A protein has these predicted regions:
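P-loop NTPase catalytic phosphate-binding loop
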Residues: 1-5, 10, 22-38, 43-49, ...
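Pro/Ser/Thr/Gly-rich intrinsically disordered low-complexity regions
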Residues: 89, 93-95
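Terminal-proximal interaction/regulatory segments of ATP-powered molecular machines
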Residues: 362-379
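Charged, low-complexity intrinsically disordered tails
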Residues: 329-359
């Protein structure tokens, strides 16, 4: 059952019926043959599944996007293809936040190694990212200020730490703005203190690259997996430090087999901010709201993702090869971060993962069943 349907009131159901009727009437007024045959509801948007007539062209509906949004009384709509139909995604009037700790109730306690929990997909299921999959490996997170890039990075890192022991996974954090990763300073999985300055970033990357080369040279096993996360990589590269640039490129080009994963966020994914040799080796793209269709193409690497009509505040599309999945990023507020870090610290003293392979284990249930932050928001 989709995430929100179990809590849906009669007013929301009436709104859905009314919107479906409006969509069909508007399309019919333009002589477009289409019926609403299904509805999927997520915390922030609803997907109306359209069955098109044989002669109906998708572009004819795409060209009416603004008119449809105006008729429905919403800021924008997004078109997405399903396996057998077309879907029209519409913002909900009363969106609900998604919190990581609450979401963990629906996540299997035994995930594949180095798999991150990102949020909730459009079909109401937890959306995960297996970093060891060849089409993932390294990740670029892009979008305008306020779209939720840093919050998504934090959630990604915390979920990895919850499901992987320190012996199997370590994290290197680079934070040129000195704000994004500060709440994670107590993470037991940290390989080194958070690098905030240019010199600290250069030193940390030099060590990571040397470890990658040692593993290559000695044919050493790729463990522990090392996650290198950079918040606002364009700021880090803005000073033209070639050592840092080359270290990031080498990690992206050669890190996979040695057990390294590079995660970079940026609000400027253009070639002048993120070198082509680096971006080309970050195959997985998590794209939040961007300013235009051209910027969506630049960030995602493929056309027609609809990132320019996303709503911000954690509304993302994941681009994995040719597959595009819309999801709402899970939010982790300050109080929840403290709870998670305390659980991770306790688990590290016992030499275990904070989420053990049993849904009935105390360490799992005690963490997941705590209430989310009362004062959390999505800003």
């Amino acid at each position: 059952m989709p995430f929100i349907l179990q809590h849906m009131d009669s007013q929301t159901r009436e709104w859905l019926d009314y919107q479906a009727d409006l969509i069909e009437a508007l399309l019919a007024s333009h002589k477009i043959e289409a019926l609403v045959t299904g509805v999927q509801v997520s915390p922030r948007w609803v997907r109306f599944v359209l069955q098109l007539g044989l002669s109906t062209k998708i572009n004819s509906i795409q060209n009416l996007s603004e008119e449809i949004a105006l008729a429905l009384g919403v800021p924008s709509v997004r078109l997405a293809r399903t396996s057998s139909a077309l879907a029209l995604e519409v913002p909900l009037p009363n969106p609900q936040p998604v919190y990581l700790l609450a979401l963990l109730r629906d996540v299997p306690p035994l995930l594949p190694p180095v798999t991150a929990v990102l949020g909730l997909s459009i079909d109401g299921e937890p959306f995960t990212l297996p970093l060891m999959a060849p089409e993932v490996t390294h990740v670029l997170i892009a979008g305008v200020t306020g779209c939720g890039k840093t919050e998504l990075l934090r959630t990604l890192i915390l979920s990895l730490a919850l499901y992987n022991r320190q012996a199997h996974l370590q994290v290197a954090l680079i934070d040129p703005k000195r704000r994004g990763f500060a709440p994670l300073a107590g993470l037991p999985h940290l390989l080194a203190p958070i690098a905030n300055t240019q010199a600290e970033a250069r030193e940390l990357l030099a060590y990571v690259v040397s470890e990658m080369e040692r593993r290559d040279r000695e044919d050493a096993p790729p463990t522990p997996r090392i996650i290198v996360a950079v918040d606002e990589v364009s700021d880090l590269l803005a000073r033209g430090d070639k050592e840092i640039e080359q270290a990031l490129i080498r990690l992206a080009q050669r890190g996979r087999e040695a057990g390294f994963h590079l995660l970079c966020s940026t609000q400027r994914p253009s070639a002048d901010a993120v070198p082509g040799a680096l971006k080309a080796n970050l195959p997985a793209r998590l794209v939040g709201k961007v300013a235009s269709g051209q910027e969506a193409l630049t960030a995602a690497g493929i056309p027609n993702t609809g990132a320019e009509v996303l709503m911000g505040n954690g509304d993302f599309v994941a681009v994995l090869g040719a597959q595009v999945t819309r999801f709402q990023a899970a939010y982790t507020g300050a109080a929840d971060i403290r709870r998670i870090l305390a659980r991770l610290e306790a688990a590290s003293r016992g030499g275990s993962a904070a989420v053990p392979p049993s849904p009935n284990a105390e360490t799992y249930s005690a963490l997941r069943d705590r209430p989310a932050d009362a004062d959390s928001d999505l800003s």
